[in-house]
Amino acid sequence: MGQKVNPIGLRLGINRTWDSRWFANKGEYSKLLHEDMRIREVLMKNLKQAAVSKIIIERPHKKCRVTIHSARPGVVIGKKGADIDKIRKLVSKLTDSEVVINIVEVRKPEIDATLVADSIAQQLERRVAFRRAMKRAVQSAIRLGAEGIRINCSGRLGGAEIARLEWYREGRVPLHTLRADVDYGVATAHTAYGTCGIKVWIFKGEILEHDPMAQDRKMAELDHAGGGGGGERRRRERDAA
């Protein structure tokens, strides 16, 4: 059933960890879960232009630490940190805890499945040919080090009368192999003819250690090796300001 299940959910606790990282006492769980859902919904709505890959929420003692992974951290921070203050106030209205906002830069958006799916959705909304958008995304991902990528586009593609599914794959994407580091992202394009669904699977190699934090460590090491640390630097600059 590896082809049917969400590849991130399948690997949780093996080499992937959750995007919400906290423990709740009995009776608090549903309240905090709904808080997380509202926070993510509001942030994604307000940061449409910031190319947000994922939002991680941690809750140390009486705090709510929100880490935004973005390909355009400058858009999130704004001039002299003005926009990030607005975001902090926005999130503070949704939770009783003290809010801390961190920004992490996504160094290679071309191999981030969520950002690739969003990019294709935006191109379809601008009436770019779906085959061209898919092929361009596949070529960029392979060029930047992905070992395999698969893209599915479904709906009334090109304004066709009958909805259909088109897919494009290059390299290999082993969905059954649990040690495989497979990133997965979905997006919806709202076109004049209706909605089109985009699904993206990107295979980035294998993670041999059995540790839920292994994938996070791998991405941090890749960022550091590629001259990363931009997100950390921006956090320090913001805190200093």
From Swiss-Prot:
Domain KH type-2: start-end pairs: 39-107
Biased composition (Basic and acidic residues): 231-241
Record-linked Pfam families: KH_2, Ribosomal_S3_C
PROSITE patterns recorded: KH_TYPE_2 (PS50823), RIBOSOMAL_S3 (PS00548)
GO BP term, pick one: translation
Stretch list, region Disordered: 219-241
Keyword terms of this UniProt record: Ribonucleoprotein, Ribosomal protein, RNA-binding, rRNA-binding
Domain of life: Bacteria
NCBIfam families the UniProt entry points to: rpsC_bact
Subunit structure of this chain's protein: Part of the 30S ribosomal subunit. Forms a tight complex with proteins S10 and S14.
PANTHER family noted in UniProt: 30S/40S RIBOSOMAL PROTEIN S3, SMALL RIBOSOMAL SUBUNIT PROTEIN US3C
UniProt family annotation: Belongs to the universal ribosomal protein uS3 family.
UniProt protein name: Small ribosomal subunit protein uS3
